[in-house]
Amino acid sequence: MPVHDDHCNPNPAPLYLGLMSGTSIDGIDAALVRINANPITHCELIAAQTSAWDPNLRTTLLELSQGQNTASLDQLGWLDAQVGLAFATAANTLIAKTGIKHTQIRAIGSHGQTIRHRPHGDLPFTWQLGDAHRIAELTGITTVADFRRRDVAAGGQGAPLMPAFHLAILGSANENRAVLNLGGIANLTLIPMTGPVLGFDTGPANALLDSWYQRHHHETFDQSGNFAASGKINQKLLACLLDDPWFTLPPPKSTGREQFHLDWMTKQLEPTPPSPADVQATLLELTAVTVADALLRQQPKTTRLLICGGGAHNPVLMARLATHLPNVTVESIQTYGLNPDYLEAMGFAWLAAQTLDGQPSNLPSVTGARGLRLLGAIHPA
């Protein structure tokens, strides 16, 4: 995937590289993008790839993020360094495949790996591992990271952070739109023709679906939703899951594996539980129902729902969303020439550009922060 130099353009739009690993911890997404100068309204994906986690490191991160394990200070320091090394390796691997020089990339935007997200309480916090100093050192590229904590310090949820990016590249003056990221957790961005943008998590998505599937199969996820399609929705289990008070919380709200993990679901199983396929079908329906309910409640006149994330490749989930939203066009962002697997990584490249240009990138209407804030810490090359 060589990238040609801009011989005809002495001032090409700068290149940025975004790095992202979500709540599923199923890989490190790296996206190389070319971003227009301010106002930033267009991002061109130049190259992208997903790097696999070391299996033992992934297991440790999953256990830590789900509250199933505690770690000593030494272990946390080691994990921070390991995640930073893994992110730097993912960046360098992609750069090597493109044939461009590291010096052609203005900055890396790194999300890191969330191990705890506690946006409520007397002293809320969010914590992402991935030593950005190490990323900058090993790549030789200025790295912007730690995007969420400034918003939390300003009274916000620190999530979701993609709505400003979604608005910039997918907003429309002609129809009310929504963007749905179906990653480990499902989150919505509501983009009305006029008025403030809203964004919030709606509940679990691939985090539960993948975990349950992996318990019963050797593969990592339910390819094309076939396992869910082979089962039947268990209405009693679905009602028990929907009874969780988190679902009735109003936005702004965000969540993670510490809230919605496999133990949370298995506690609801009856003494004679449904078949594994029926549970998978029910978990898929949980995602579809909670997304549809949230969308209809918060933006009932939505015309179009654009899907990104791994769930965009699950035709069964896409069909259930369409069933629950009969008056909404439900489609993948691929329709608009965007890769659904790398939109978040592109978004963190965009956040890095915003920060280096001195532009705030949180939306108080989304996170609940006291105002616009410049996000992230800059680690020079």
Swiss-Prot record:
The reaction(s) this protein catalyses: 1,6-anhydro-N-acetyl-beta-muramate + ATP + H2O = N-acetyl-D-muramate 6-phosphate + ADP + H(+)
CDD domains: ASKHA_NBD_ANMK (cd24050)
Gene Ontology molecular function: any one: phosphotransferase activity, alcohol group as acceptor
InterPro entries assigned to the protein according to its UniProt record, in alphabetical order: Anhydro_N_Ac-Mur_kinase, ATPase_NBD
Protein's UniProt keywords contain Signal: no
Binding residues for ATP: G22, T23, S24, I25, D26, G27, I28, D29
GO biological process entries: 1,6-anhydro-N-acetyl-beta-muramic acid catabolic process; amino sugar metabolic process; peptidoglycan turnover
Keyword tags: ATP-binding, Carbohydrate metabolism, Kinase, Nucleotide-binding, Transferase
The enzyme's E.C. designation: 2.7.1.170
One Pfam family recorded for the sequence: AnmK
Domain of life: Bacteria
Recorded metabolic or biological pathway in which this protein acts: Amino-sugar metabolism; 1,6-anhydro-N-acetylmuramate degradation; Cell wall biogenesis; peptidoglycan recycling
Family: Belongs to the anhydro-N-acetylmuramic acid kinase family.
Record function comment: Catalyzes the specific phosphorylation of 1,6-anhydro-N-acetylmuramic acid (anhMurNAc) with the simultaneous cleavage of the 1,6-anhydro ring, generating MurNAc-6-P. Is required for the utilization of anhMurNAc either imported from the medium or derived from its own cell wall murein, and thus plays a role in cell wall recycling.
Protein name, UniProt field: Anhydro-N-acetylmuramic acid kinase
Classification of source organism: Bacteria, Pseudomonadati, Pseudomonadota, Gammaproteobacteria, Lysobacterales
